[in-house]
Curated annotation (Swiss-Prot):
Organism phylogeny: Eukaryota, Viridiplantae, Streptophyta, Embryophyta, Tracheophyta
Protein name: Non-specific lipid transfer protein GPI-anchored 17
Keywords: Cell membrane, Disulfide bond, Glycoprotein, GPI-anchor, Lipoprotein, Membrane, Signal
Gene3D superfamilies: Plant lipid-transfer and hydrophobic proteins
Organism: Arabidopsis thaliana
Cysteines joined through disulfide linkages: 31-74, 42-58, 59-99
Intracellular or extracellular location(s): Cell membrane
Coiled coil: none
Keyword Translocase tagged: no
Length: 116
């Protein structure tokens, strides 16, 4: 039940973030929207110690954000998602590799191909 409430709040946050329409910040807004969706899809894996493998939906978002919004992706992987209650953990740091997205955030940001 508690996770249901959190997911509803996360959904509301993503909707609010995606409805922002300031043209000067469109890239930043899109990045926040994409990161929010990634956090939403990866939330169960990142917060439940009984889940040992991220879902396809989670990995799909990790791939998309990792390829399209590299700076934002690296910031999330290195700093967590405090607005979603996601803290830096080994699961978060392992997420790109588990989803087949390889690269060095902050060190060339060169992601290799994946097989999603």
């Amino acid at each position: 039940m508690k996770i249901g409430v959190v997911l509803v709040l996360l959904t509301v946050f993503v909707v609010v973030m995606s409805s922002t329409s300031v043209s000067a910040q469109s890239d930043e807004d899109e990045c926040l929207k994409e990161t929010g969706q990634m956090q939403l899809n990866c939330f169960p894996y990142l917060t439940d110690n009984r889940i040992h493998t991220p879902s396809f939906a989670c990995c799909s978002e990790v791939y998309t954000v990792g390829k399209t919004y590299v700076d934002c992706f690296c910031q999330f992987i290195n700093n967590g998602g405090p607005s979603f209650g996601i803290v830096v953990s080994q699961k978060l740091l392992d997420l790109p590799e588990l989803c087949g997205v390889y690269g060095a955030c902050g060190n060339g940001k060169n992601f290799k191909n994946t097989s999603l």
